[in-house]
């Protein structure tokens, strides 16, 4: 099976993506996997929609696509409409290429999200991407909410997590939470 990872620098980093690849190999030991790493720093959903063909779909029929763009869509100042259109561009194009493709949307955390999450508010960019996930009935993993809750409970600090570009501990938290959703899916 072909598994692709489309996103920004957090996806490009050695970390959660590599951990998920290893987990999938253990989860499906008789499957020959091709992993497509399509993380490019500072790219959100609009650049992702434009590079989907060359960076992901040209590599073969994709069975599972992980997509994340919340941090960069927010950082790069894309409007709500641009955030929705960019993410929907990725999802629609991916599903046209393979209607049976599984797509999992991920929402990572960065500094400006924390005060909102601590007040029980969801960052607008996550709500905008969730509109797309809900419309297409896609599973999504709100890692921003998960990590903020764990920090509020005192499990670890932002510094211990590693910040926006997590250290290995932070990536392990991301991978463990994603794996819980994979447990439900497969």
Please name every model-derived segment.
Residues 1-15, 40-44:
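Catalytic nucleophile-elbow at a beta strand-turn-alpha helix junction centered on a G-D-S/GDSL motif
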Residues 18-34, 38, 43, 47-185:
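Alpha-helical cap/lid subdomain in secreted, periplasmic
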């Amino acid at each position: 099976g072909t598994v692709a990872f489309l996103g920004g620098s957090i996806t490009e980093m050695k970390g959660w993506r590599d951990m998920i690849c290893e987990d999938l190999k253990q989860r499906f030991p008789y499957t020959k996997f091709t992993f497509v790493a399509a993380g490019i720093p500072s790219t959100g959903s609009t650049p992702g929609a434009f590079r989907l063909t060359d960076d992901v779909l040209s590599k073969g029929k994709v069975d599972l696509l992980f997509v994340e763009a919340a941090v960069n869509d927010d950082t790069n100042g894309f409007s709500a409409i641009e955030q929705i259109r960019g993410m929907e561009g990725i999802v629609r194009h991916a599903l046209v290429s393979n209607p049976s493709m599984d797509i999992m949307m991920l929402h990572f955390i960065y500094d400006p999200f924390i005060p909102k999450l601590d007040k029980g508010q969801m960052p607008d960019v996550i709500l905008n991407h969730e509109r797309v996930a809900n419309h297409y009935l896609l599973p999504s993993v709100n890692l921003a909410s998960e990590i903020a809750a764990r920090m509020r409970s005192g499990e670890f600090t932002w510094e211990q997590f590693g910040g926006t570009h997590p250290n290995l501990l932070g990536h392990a938290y991301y991978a463990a939470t994603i794996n819980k959703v994979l447990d439900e899916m497969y």
